[in-house]
């Protein structure tokens, strides 16, 4: 029995001192070190002692890091992977290394990196990712790296960086972002402002320069001239008609998204109806209301007609088209959105009392209300409903404008006799 006990302890001791054959393992300066550098390795070898705190795999031929690559060494504090052939770091390759303080991935070919793995590395103090093929860094990539002191992103292929990328790095003292092909458009202006104001050391600032546009090529970011830039704004309203559109019989709903911003924002319609969600990211019809060539629609006249001028037309509006219609605008400086809930109602649901002589709809961000004369009035808590008469497409048989026969008020939708369309306006 005693011999079995000794054998068990011997086995445990042997496991504790195990080391992959190509590597050297030992203790130095109080650290358990595994040195696998310059071993011509093409994969991370298995069999490391679980108590390893420093691992060098530099100067090998590793092509990538798969999920769980370092699961055997959860106590790692330093990991050196420079000068390999790494192109991809898979999700889960680094996520288990919650004690990691130093990570060197420099001088590789990384273009595909699992940025979400960094969210678990809250102890990280040094991150070297220079001399790779990175083209994009998510805005929240460094959100958990509150202990990070040094970040090296120089010599990559970064064209821009999202505003706020470095905000979580409250301990940062050293940043290298030189020698990237930055596009000096509105989206990069924040970086110039931040770099000039921050206490973080940013060396080689003359090499943080523009690659495009051509007129600014070679200009250091610190000397970037003022650019005409503004974040998007949107205003969602209704239109009485759509000039030039060939409308089929039925009810017609017309919405218009007025977009402003510099550079010109991209417009996107998000429609939530009973049957699901419809996304429209570009115009799908011409001015005649017919589908543009190449538009993936089932017929020559789409159910939801998105025009290049920001208008959206639903030629056959009914119960199946009830829902939330959202207009989104995005450019390099951000995004803006405005929404409207649309439902059919019959007369007698409060229409006459609410309509009165004028009708209202909440403007974007509560800035005011639009009346039949398109005047802006102060918005109040009661201004959350617009009641609009509907009539069949075509010439109306009767007018509804403030009792004046034959005249329609500006802004009224012609959508179906004796029906009411309720707009519950919201904006975000």
From Swiss-Prot:
Please give an example of a GO cellular component term from this record. Answer: extracellular region
Query: Under what name is this protein listed?
Result: Immunoglobulin superfamily containing leucine-rich repeat protein
Q: What is the gene name?
A: ISLR
Ranges where the Ig-like domain occurs: 232-343
Can you tell me which residues the record assigns to a coiled coil?
Answer: none
Show the disulfide pairing: 257-327
Q: Which residues are glycosylated?
A: 51, 309
Alphabetized SMART domains for the sequence: IGc2, LRR_TYP, LRRCT
Q: What is the lineage of its organism?
A: Eukaryota, Metazoa, Chordata, Craniata, Vertebrata
Q: Which UniProt keywords apply?
A: Disulfide bond, Glycoprotein, Immunoglobulin domain, Leucine-rich repeat, Repeat, Secreted, Signal
InterPro entries referenced in this protein's UniProt entry, alphabetically: Cys-rich_flank_reg_C, Ig-like_dom, Ig-like_dom_sf, Ig-like_fold, Ig_sub2, Leu-rich_rpt, Leu-rich_rpt_typical-subtyp, LRR_dom_sf
Q: Which residues form the signal peptide?
A: 1-18
Q: Where is the LRRCT domain?
A: 180-231
* Top-rank taxon, per record: Eukaryota
The listed locations are:
Secreted
Gene3D superfamilies xref list: Immunoglobulins, Ribonuclease Inhibitor
- Entry's SUPFAM superfamilies? Immunoglobulin, L domain-like
Please state the protein's primary subcellular location: secreted
């Amino acid at each position: 029995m005693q011999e079995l006990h000794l054998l068990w302890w011997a086995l445990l001791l042997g496991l504790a001192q195990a080391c992959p054959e190509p590597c050297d393992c030992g203790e130095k300066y109080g650290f358990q070190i595994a040195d696998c550098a310059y071993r011509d390795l093409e994969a991370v070898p298995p069999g490391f002692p679980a108590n390893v705190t420093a691992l060098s795999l530099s100067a090998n031929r590793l092509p990538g890091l798969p999920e769980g690559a370092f699961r055997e060494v959860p106590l790692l504090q330093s990991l050196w992977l420079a000068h390999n052939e790494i192109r991809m770091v898979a999700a889960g390759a680094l996520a288990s290394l919650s004690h990691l303080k130093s990570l060197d991935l420099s001088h590789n070919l990384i273009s595909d990196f699992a940025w979400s793995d960094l969210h678990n590395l809250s102890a990280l103090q040094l991150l070297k990712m220079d001399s790779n093929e990175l083209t994009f860094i998510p805005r929240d990539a460094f959100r958990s790296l509150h202990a990070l002191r040094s970040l090296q992103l120089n010599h990559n292929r970064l064209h821009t960086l999202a505003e706020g990328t470095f905000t979580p790095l409250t301990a940062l003292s050293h940043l290298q972002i030189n020698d990237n092909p930055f596009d000096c458009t509105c989206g990069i202006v924040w970086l110039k402002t931040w770099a000039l104001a921050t206490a973080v050391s940013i060396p080689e600032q003359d090499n943080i320069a523009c690659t495009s546009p051509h007129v600014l090529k070679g200009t250091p970011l610190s000397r970037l001239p003022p650019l005409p830039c503004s974040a998007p704004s949107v205003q969602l309203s209704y239109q009485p008609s759509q000039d030039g559109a060939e409308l089929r019989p039925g009810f017609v709903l017309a919405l218009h998204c007025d977009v402003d911003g510099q550079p010109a924002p991209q417009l996107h319609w998000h429609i939530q109806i009973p049957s699901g969600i419809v996304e429209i990211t570009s115009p799908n019809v011409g001015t005649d209301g017919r589908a543009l060539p190449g538009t993936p629609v089932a017929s020559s006249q789409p159910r939801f007609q998105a025009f290049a001028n920001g208008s959206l037309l639903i030629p056959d509006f009914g119960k199946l088209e009830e829902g939330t219609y959202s207009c989104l605008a995005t450019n390099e400086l951000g995004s803006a959105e405005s929404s409207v809930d649309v439902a059919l109602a019959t007369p007698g649901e409060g229409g006459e009392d609410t309509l009165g002589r004028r009708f209202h709809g909440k403007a974007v961000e509560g800035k005011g209300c639009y009346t039949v004369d398109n005047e802006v009035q102060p918005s109040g808590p009661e201004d959350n409903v617009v009641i609009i008469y509907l009539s069949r497409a075509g010439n109306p048989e009767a007018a509804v404008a403030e009792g004046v026969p034959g005249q329609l008020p500006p802004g009224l939708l012609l959508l179906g006799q004796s029906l009411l369309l309720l707009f519950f306006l919201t904006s975000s």
